[in-house]
């Protein structure tokens, strides 16, 4: 790479030797203290000093009267199931302790998850223990019984049928075959009933485009493993688009550096996404330019002239004909038709674009929703049943939808939570969490996934299937409703000659079975007519699902609210992202509040200045401003300033769905013309990366560089010539003695592949769930007091729209020469006999000397006793990990509880501990398999081999802390640049 290339975190990052100051509101401007504030501060200081002297309360265990056969107290057991948190249908393994689920891991055998899991699925376990869920059936907002509710519903449905008005069942895409069966029976019973599906994040344009081109409305499956050339047009397939976990797994398989070839990835987008950050080449185009670019690519493929950058892309696609893949995340039918044409002309159909086993994840129709709005406005709807969606929040016409609902006599909500739509319904059928219910789902044709209860139902809830089935005469238990359906039809879908009982047992035990794919009828390809251009010129809105909130259904999840956005590092909020050039042009700075107006509607948002974004775009994430987030008003400690996380009645972030518009009835997320005006107000942005915490002293840098970079990278061409290219080695450390501490048994170490890491943050949430890391609230994050043991540092290189991005997971480096250990006055931080830097909580008195002396800034201090008042929510805590108290320092423990468990199990079996027996929480969840952990004393272990890899290096190695966590140089597949040599 270029010798002068430098990665940076923020424009205003501090320089070496410059003092570090806190946020503006923490800088005292007056020396006058009143007596009350002084006593509060003095009291806190004394309490922090004395916290290590307090006794742990005694909690007595109550034994089982009759112990279940499968439960051994204190030992985890696992269930195979399926996640319903993000809609990807990943297979999961549910870890239970004493009859309560506490952790999810990806099922390594399931084709969708392949052992990985996204952060949303990881965090969904806490929603099971949400005390604010709806736990009883309700009629007119009063708790009732299911018998009374069923009687009320049937009476009103029959009344609606006699009146000749429509009964509309409005749902998200139904992926359950048995649910489809019972819905079909419901529609047959009520001849005036219809079923409308829509997806809160619409994919309608892809389905509609396939109907234009192939005569059938369907969503194909995409095979990234077989794609040697990937062109992604605003499709964040490594972040939130369709099946990011599966796509990440497959994407990484075709980027194996041991092979002679790795896939080439070009990303065209208007905002900086997770996928764009990992692309080999990234091209910034506004929504107005996107359609023209795709047209130019198609014309170039047909040898119709030169079209600038489109010609370069077309040549690359043509070079990998039949092994390329073109996708688009733009919900515009014109672009999707062009994408279909290009894939067809390149011969990708049946190779990387699969029609024989399509995806059933998304099947919603925006056209059907538009028709429903018309019917509701005209008063033709007499009963509305809503399941899995929140149209009052989701739709641009949400306010009108709510008004129309008031005129409908019978409104039934199937929801586990109170939301904007449920509160307008006169009947609420509370749904159980997916971890306490049965379900069958075919997210992808040919893969039948099973969801099974992993805990006794916590309330008087029942599934959508149970309600609809019961109202059509199918009275049975949840399990039998599914089992009886498959018993009738399994012979038409099963593979092999198994009996039904054996087939069913395998389905429940494994969490999935492979069945005969349900193909779609694909007609001859038709070119189709293009729709109008995507957008007008000028400033436009780009609305996108954030990696944390998606469509907003998880807005009440505190773990996801406090999870930093992978790119902006913003928590507890959404913002108006503007390019530096546009912000300067508008005269606004970061944290200024602006008014964004579109189609006569407006919203006020704080400004976030985002590198790598189109100058013609204001990008805002969806999923915020959701009802239910007012619960976080008092989240966080009662600090001296009495500053609440939220104002009274305030929601987290702002809803922007009302700014969207429909084009040809299809919901458009890109290209809505907007205007911006200043409000004169500012807002606090709770960012987790507000200055550069890692600094390399200039005098330790190689002669050719000002500082040695902690992000080291190279190109694939340079790597093939010299595997050590891009690695800037430190000087040989001069020492007066040999290794002063031999590790006789195990010496644990870790390596993280920067080329694999996508920044998805699955590891961050997995670590938080596994290790009982507390949520501190927006105010404390703003004060730089977040508690995450694992953080993902995001670095930029370049200026304006032409920036490269790198992600670097940063955790305790477990140094063999740890700077934190000798400064602790009470030996609370010590070195284990196996090379781990350990924190002894009951010794710690909170001097924070260790945090001050840590060059990696990975230690976290408990400034307060963070709330654990909700007894139901406390059920999610891992009993193997101590819940830390105020005044105690904490950090990554390298999942010592998992290490000890594996060692004990191996000893009990009388076998040696094998490489791979121990999987750390972050490692196990990573969809990209970027993290490797093992024993450095075992020369045959994967970690030992990676340490000898020429790509391996340590961050700040010149400080001689001798970390056991190393990194592998990032490799991009792009044209070779002037490669800087390494320094040995």
Annotated model-derived regions:
Residues 436-456:
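Glycine/threonine-rich phosphate-binding loop and adjacent beta-strand/alpha-helix elements that clamp
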Residues 379, 393-436, 581, 586:
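Hydrophobic alpha/beta core scaffold segments
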Residues 149-167, 189, 221-229, 309-324, ...:
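Glycine-rich phosphate/diphosphate-binding loops that line cofactor/substrate pockets in enzymes
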Residues 25-29, 457-519, 592, 779:
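N-terminal leader/propeptide and maturation segments of large enzyme subunits in energy/redox metabolism
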Residues 321-323, 328-386, 392, 547:
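Acidic catalytic cores of enzymes that act on phosphate-bearing nucleotides/polynucleotides
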Residues 240-261, 396-412, 447-450:
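A short, gly/pro- and small-residue-rich
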Residues 1-303, 428, 564, 571-577, ...:
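N-terminal export/assembly segments and adjacent metallocofactor-ligating motifs
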Residues 488-568:
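Long, low-complexity segments enriched in small/aliphatic residues
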């Amino acid at each position: 790479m270029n010798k002068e290339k430098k990665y940076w975190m923020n424009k205003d990052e501090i320089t070496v030797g410059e003092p570090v100051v806190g946020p503006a509101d923490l800088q005292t401007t007056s020396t006058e203290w009143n007596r009350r504030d002084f006593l509060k501060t003095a009291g806190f200081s004394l309490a922090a000093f004395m916290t290590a002297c307090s006794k742990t309360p005694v909690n007595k265990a109550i034994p089982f009267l009759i112990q279940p056969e499968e439960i051994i107290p204190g030992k985890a057991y696992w269930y195979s199931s399926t996640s319903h948190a993000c809609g990807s249908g990943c297979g999961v393994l549910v870890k239970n302790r004493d009859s309560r689920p506490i952790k999810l891991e990806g099922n390594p055998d399931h084709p969708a998850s392949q052992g990985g899991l996204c952060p949303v699925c990881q965090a969904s376990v806490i929603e099971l223990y949400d005390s604010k869920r709806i736990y009883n059936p309700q009629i007119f907002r009063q708790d009732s019984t299911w018998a009374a509710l069923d009687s009320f519903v049937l009476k009103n449905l029959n009344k609606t049928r006699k009146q000749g008005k429509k009964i509309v069942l409005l749902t998200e895409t139904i992926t359950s075959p048995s649910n489809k069966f019972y819905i079909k029976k419901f529609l047959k019973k009520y001849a005036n009933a219809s079923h409308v599906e829509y997806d809160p994040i619409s994919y309608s344009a892809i389905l509609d485009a396939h109907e234009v081109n192939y005569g059938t409305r369907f969503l194909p499956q995409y095979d990234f493993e077989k794609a040697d050339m990937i062109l992604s047009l605003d499709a964040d397939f490594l972040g939130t688009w369709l099946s990011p976990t599966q796509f990440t797994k497959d994407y990484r398989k075709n980027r194996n550096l041991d092979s002679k070839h790795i896939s080439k990835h070009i990303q065209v987008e208007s905002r900086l996404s997770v996928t764009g950050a990992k692309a080999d080449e990234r091209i910034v185009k506004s929504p107005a330019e996107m359609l023209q670019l795709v047209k130019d690519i198609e014309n170039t493929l047909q040898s119709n002239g030169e079209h600038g950058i489109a010609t370069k892309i077309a040549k690359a696609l043509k070079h990998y004909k039949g092994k390329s893949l073109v996708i688009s995340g733009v919900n515009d039918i014109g672009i999707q038709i062009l994408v279909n044409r290009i894939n067809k002309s390149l011969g990708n159909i049946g190779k990387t674009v699969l029609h024989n086993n399509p995806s059933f994840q998304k099947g919603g129709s925006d056209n059907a929703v538009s028709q429903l709005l018309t019917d509701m406005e005209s008063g033709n709807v007499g009963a509305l049943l809503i399941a899995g969606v929140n149209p009052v929040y989701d739709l641009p016409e949400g306010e009108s939808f709510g008004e129309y609902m008031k005129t409908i006599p019978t409104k039934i909500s199937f929801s586990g939570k109170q939301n904007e739509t449920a509160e307008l319904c006169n009947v609420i059928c509370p749904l159980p969490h997916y971890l306490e219910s049965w379900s069958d789902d075919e997210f992808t044709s040919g893969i039948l996934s099973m969801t099974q209860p992993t805990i006794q139902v916590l309330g008087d809830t029942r599934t959508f299937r149970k309600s609809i089935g019961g109202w059509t005469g199918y009275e049975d238990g949840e399990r039998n409703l599914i089992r009886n359906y498959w018993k009738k039809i399994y012979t038409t879908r099963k593979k092999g000659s198994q009996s039904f009982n054996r087939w069913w047992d395998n389905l429940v035990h494994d969490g999935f079975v492979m069945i005969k794919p349900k193909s779609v009828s694909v007609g001859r390809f038709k070119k189709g007519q293009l729709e109008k251009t995507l957008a007008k010129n000028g400033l436009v809105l780009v609305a996108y699902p954030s990696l944390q909130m998606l469509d907003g259904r998880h807005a009440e999840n505190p773990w996801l609210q406090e999870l930093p956005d992978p790119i902006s590092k913003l928590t507890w909020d959404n913002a108006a992202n503007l390019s530096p050039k546009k912000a300067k042009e508008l005269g606004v700075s970061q944290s200024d509040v602006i008014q964004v107006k579109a189609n006569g509607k407006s919203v006020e948002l704080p400004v976030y200045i985002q590198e790598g974004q189109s100058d013609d775009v204001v990008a805002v994430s969806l999923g915020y401003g959701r009802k239910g987030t007012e619960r976080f008003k008092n989240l966080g400690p009662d600090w001296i300033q009495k500053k609440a996380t939220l104002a009274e009645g305030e929601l987290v972030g702002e809803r922007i769905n009302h700014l969207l518009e429909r084009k040809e009835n299809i919901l458009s997320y890109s290209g809505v013309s907007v205007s911006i005006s200043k409000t004169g107000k500012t807002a606090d942005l709770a960012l987790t990366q507000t200055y550069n915490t890692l600094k390399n002293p200039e005098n330790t840098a190689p002669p050719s560089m000002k500082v040695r970079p902690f992000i080291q990278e190279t190109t694939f061409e340079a790597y093939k010539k010299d595997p050590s290219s891009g690695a800037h080695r430190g000087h040989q450390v001069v020492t007066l003695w040999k290794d002063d501490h031999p590790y006789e048994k195990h010496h644990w170490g870790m390596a993280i592949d920067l080329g694999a890491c996508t920044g998805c943050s699955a590891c961050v949430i997995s670590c938080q769930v596994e290790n009982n890391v507390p949520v501190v609230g927006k105010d404390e994050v703003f004060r730089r007091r977040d508690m995450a043991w694992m953080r993902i540092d995001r670095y930029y290189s370049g200026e304006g729209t032409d920036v490269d991005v790198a992600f670097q997971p940063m955790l305790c480096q477990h140094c063999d020469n740890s700077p934190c250990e000798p400064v602790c006055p009470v030996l609370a931080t010590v070195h284990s006999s196996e090379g781990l830097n350990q924190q002894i909580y009951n010794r710690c008195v909170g001097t924070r000397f260790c945090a001050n002396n840590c060059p990696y800034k990975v230690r976290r201090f408990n400034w307060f006793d963070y709330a654990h008042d909700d007894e139901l929510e406390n059920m999610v805590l891992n009993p193997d990990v101590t819940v830390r108290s105020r005044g105690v320092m904490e950090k990554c423990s390298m999942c010592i509880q998992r290490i000890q468990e594996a060692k004990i199990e191996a000893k009990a079996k009388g076998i040696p501990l094998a490489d791979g027996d121990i999987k750390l929480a972050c490692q196990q969840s990573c969809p990209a398999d970027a993290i490797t952990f093992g024993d450095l004393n075992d020369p045959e272990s994967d970690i030992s081999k990676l340490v000898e890899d020429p790509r391996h290096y340590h961050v700040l190695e010149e400080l001689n802390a001798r970390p056991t966590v190393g990194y592998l140089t990032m490799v991009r597949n792009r044209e070779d640049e002037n490669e800087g040599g390494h320094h040995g």
